[in-house]
């Protein structure tokens, strides 16, 4: 009798290196570092957004964010609103955009009133003992200033959108 050599292969799944890991190995923090969010180009882009620029006052941050949102929120109301095929489409769309800016301003102020009920007096220090200044936006006064800037910027963005719809010759 001849004996055949048989070889059996078993695949074993070893420890795979994880690309996405929770911060400090604690999955309950709820903030995951991904290759996208931890990439230098993405972190530079995010740090240049108006909400994260710490060198700018909260009022100016709110104006900048409000201008962009007010300008872009009026367009869908003009082109997709119920009065889109009438002569009053621009006026109705811009008034609807202004109404949405007012509603979002109320939402921002409600968020600020609930999120920043108490201001922590405890300062943050680095390992060398140097004091780290807090972002002024992360306080009730800073958030109120941001909300005021948002309102002014948002309504200005809607007004700018209306002016452009009336002035640009190729709009209609």
Name each model-derived stretch.
Residues 81-172:
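Membrane-interacting alpha-helical segments
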Residues 43-57, 131-140:
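Cytosolic juxtamembrane amphipathic/interface segments immediately preceding
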Residues 14-20, 39-52:
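Hydrophobic, membrane-facing alpha-helical anchors
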Residues 53-71:
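Transmembrane alpha-helical segments and their cytosolic interface motifs
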Residues 33-40, 59-60, 68, 101, ...:
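Mature, well-folded catalytic/scaffold domains that follow N-terminal targeting or propeptide regions
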Residues 1-22:
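N-terminal chloroplast transit peptides
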Residues 21-41:
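Short, charged cytosolic
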């Amino acid at each position: 009798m001849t004996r055949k050599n048989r070889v059996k292969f078993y695949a074993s799944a070893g420890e795979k290196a994880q690309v996405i890991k929770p911060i400090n190995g604690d999955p309950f923090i709820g903030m995951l570092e991904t290759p996208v969010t931890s990439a230098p180009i993405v972190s530079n882009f995010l740090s240049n957004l108006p909400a994260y620029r710490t060198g700018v006052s909260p009022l100016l941050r709110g104006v900048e964010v409000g201008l962009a949102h007010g300008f872009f929120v009026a367009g869908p109301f003009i082109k997709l609103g119920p009065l889109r095929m009438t002569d009053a489409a621009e006026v109705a769309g811009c008034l609807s955009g202004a109404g949405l800016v007012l509603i979002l301003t109320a939402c921002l102020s409600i968020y600020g009133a609930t999120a920043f009920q108490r201001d922590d007096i405890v300062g943050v220090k680095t390992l060398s003992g140097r004091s780290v200044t807090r972002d002024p936006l992360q306080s009730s006064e800073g958030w109120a200033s941001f909300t005021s800037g948002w309102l002014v910027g948002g309504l200005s963005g809607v007004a700018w959108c209306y002016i452009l719809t009336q002035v640009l010759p190729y709009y209609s």
